């Protein structure tokens, strides 16, 4: 999912804590602040479906299925080395790393993920 990097890019990362649904556990989660990268990224205009459109498409169907796309973005590989380098983050005492998969917080992640699903 991540690999050591020599990228010219570097974004700050930090740890936040979140409650686990249904459990009384608090789990740490690493977060990378991609705000500056997102500010200069051209938005991908791939359409994201809305609930009403999806329900209209299901009208008259006899069978339904359900997929759990847990951590879906992390299932999608970043194809180009250039894009991987843009995801580089600096972790205290661990050095510089970059993602090999689409990270959360990346501006075009939802559109890219939807394109793969479609």
Label every PLM stretch briefly.
Residues 1-118:
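Retroelement reverse transcriptase polymerase core
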């Amino acid at each position: 999912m991540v690999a050591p990097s020599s990228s010219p890019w570097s974004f700050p990362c930090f740890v936040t804590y979140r409650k686990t649904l249904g459990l009384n556990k608090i789990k740490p989660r690493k977060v990378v602040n991609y705000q500056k990268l997102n500010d200069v990224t051209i938005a991908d205009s791939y359409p994201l479906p809305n609930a009403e459109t999806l329900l209209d498409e299901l009208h008259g169907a006899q069978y339904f299925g359900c997929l759990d796309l847990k951590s879906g973005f992390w299932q999608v590989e970043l194809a180009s080395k250039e894009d991987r380098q843009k995801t580089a983050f600096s972790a205290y005492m661990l050095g510089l790393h970059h993602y090999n998969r689409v990270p959360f917080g990346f501006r075009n992640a939802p559109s890219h993920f939807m394109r793969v699903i479609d």
